[in-house]
């Protein structure tokens, strides 16, 4: 019996749901949506445009979007205890691209964890860092502690005086020694960015580290990993200059 295309799509969609209902997936970049979130994602809003910001849309008829987005912004500011939140990104990588666009210019120097040491691919020359045309310098790595070598990284930041200092990884076991490294970055005039995509739920729950209180000027993240929501991303800052 040959299934037509639509039937095959429905079958595979149902099979995917069964897989997650009857197993415990351990993929860090995935999670399970609540029935309430599924209801919102399956609504008519899912297929509508809502370009712009609440109250300043390019399309008419976006009042429902405005209400929902304003609630989301207020909730994000409350959960992460920050002055600014943008929840429009379609992923953590898109949030990183937006942050790099705002905080750097082509040719600027950025420091980050190498992909070999657990850094996210968007932090690499082949990812968002390269798309922005930045000069990448990676941190010396402490293999035993599985974190940036603090003393060597402090020297690297002071010697290179990067425009932007980036922390956060897609593979890591422990909080980043952020406060000390951020202090050194600010001493040389660098902005500090923290990619919290893979640990954002732990940060929100107060059981990891608190990047915005430990020196990060901007924190990005995903809304669908340890923070269990639909596919999307965050831009967060406690800076009074964030808009």
What kind of region is each of these model predictions?
Residues 1-5, 9-10:
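Single conserved hydrophobic/aromatic residue that forms the stacking wall/gate
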Residues 6-7, 34-35, 58-66, 154, ...:
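Short, structured coil/loop segments at alpha-helix boundaries
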Residues 24-28:
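A short N-terminal interaction module
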Residues 71-243:
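Conserved PLP-enzyme active-site core in the AAT-like
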Residues 13-22, 32-80:
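Glycine-rich phosphate-binding segment of PLP-dependent enzymes
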């Amino acid at each position: 019996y040959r299934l037509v295309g639509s039937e095959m799509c429905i079958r595979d969609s149902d099979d995917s749901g069964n897989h997650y209902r009857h197993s415990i997936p351990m993929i860090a970049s995935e999670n399970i949506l609540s029935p309430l979130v599924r209801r919102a994602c399956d609504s008519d809003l899912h297929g509508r445009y809502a370009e712009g910001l609440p109250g300043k849309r390019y399309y008419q008829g976006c009042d429902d979007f405005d209400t929902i987005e304003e609630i989301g912004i207020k909730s994000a500011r409350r959960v992460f205890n920050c002055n600014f939140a943008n929840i429009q990104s379609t992923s953590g990588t898109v949030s990183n691209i937006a942050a790099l666009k705002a905080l750097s210019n082509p040719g600027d120097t950025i420091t980050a964890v190498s992909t070999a040491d657990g850094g996210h691919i968007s932090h690499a020359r082949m990812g968002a860092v390269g798309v922005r045309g930045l000069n990448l310098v990676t941190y010396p790595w402490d293999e035993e502690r599985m974190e940036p070598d603090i003393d060597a990284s402090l020297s690297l930041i002071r010697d290179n005086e990067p425009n932007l200092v980036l922390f956060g990884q897609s593979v890591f076991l422990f909080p980043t020694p952020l406060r000390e490294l951020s202090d050194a970055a600010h001493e040389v005039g660098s902005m500090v960015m923290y990619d919290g995509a893979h640990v954002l739920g732990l940060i929100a729950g107060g059981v990891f580290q608190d990047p915005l209180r430990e020196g990060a000027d901007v924190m990005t993240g995903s809304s669908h990993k340890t923070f269990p929501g639909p596919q999307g991303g965050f831009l967060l800052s406690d800076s009074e200059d964030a808009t």
